[in-house]
């Protein structure tokens, strides 16, 4: 991924991961996985986006908060895209229920240097980060609840800047609940609604509260979505609205334009972007 030197907008949630720093050959997943009939175990390099915070509805939207809650992503420098870290992960499924758990190094990395690579394990300096999630699926509805615990605290000021270079050796956590449910469904078409909410127990962290509601229409070749988001940062409140449409052009090629309106203490922003997806 590459981008220009100047950012596109000054929104706080990050309207898209395209705003991430330039990366060349950053390692996302590398490790050993063992699978049983109802369980999986993974040991190696991994990031949180591989296993958490994604669903049929949220994966349509471009805003970064639909990929991971800002109460976590903005508050902790964890193995969240474009960073990864050493991980012990497992999941167990039974009768519509799934439990997932991952234990990570407290800070994620994406370099190839001695002191900047995803193979580092430094609990004394970086702390440890654990994330657990319980899921339930029933009649095409999906429901999630989880908690993330970090053994370090990364407090920021009202400008969103870290108060100290070294994190405090204090434990804090974030919790969330999320659900999506079809309202109408035929053999090829469906309309679903979704809602999610999250809080961070430490109000000195970058983001302490987040919520979103939205709806998605899908058929054999189209997916359209509308969502509204709210996030409480140290700098203030941010509100955003996203409209997006994904169109399947061929069996392997999709195009997806997107419009977002964002308002916060820094101003009002309107962003238009598009992504091209190729499956092979």
Residue spans of the language-model regions?
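Detector for outer-membrane/organellar transmembrane beta-barrel domains
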Residues: 99-102, 137-232, 243
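Outer-membrane beta-barrel "beta-signal"
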Residues: 268-280
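Outer-membrane beta-barrel translocator domains and adjoining extracellular loop/strand segments
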Residues: 5-10, 54-60, 110-118, 154-163, ...
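Outer membrane beta-barrel
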Residues: 1-106, 205-212, 223-233
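Loop-centered beta-sheet repeat module
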Residues: 91-154
